[in-house]
Amino acid sequence: MWNNRVILSGNLVRDVEVKVTEGESGKHVANFTVAVQRTRSKEDAVDFINCVAWEQVADYLGSYGKKGKRIELEGRLHTRSYEKDDKKIYITEVYVDDCHLTSNKNSNEEE
């Protein structure tokens, strides 16, 4: 049973870049943002959702994830915090388990 499940459909805000973590394991990670159109809103509002992908998913997005590309993803909410100037900063992001790139926002092409 899924207690923490997120499904999003939106557009990549910029090209996805993959980095390698420090240390012996050197895992591939991609941090990216998805622009998601709000539904049921009287105004044309967009939410910008921060996402993180690891290993194979990160590599896939690094190869094909370009600015404006349509993405459908499934994952889970993840929260973390850190200290800055004696203040605790909280971050909420989506850890991506699976994704599919479809087309650019103004295109009918399929990936």
Please state what every model-predicted region is.
Residues 1-111:
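Single-stranded nucleic acid-binding surfaces, predominantly the OB-fold ssDNA-binding core
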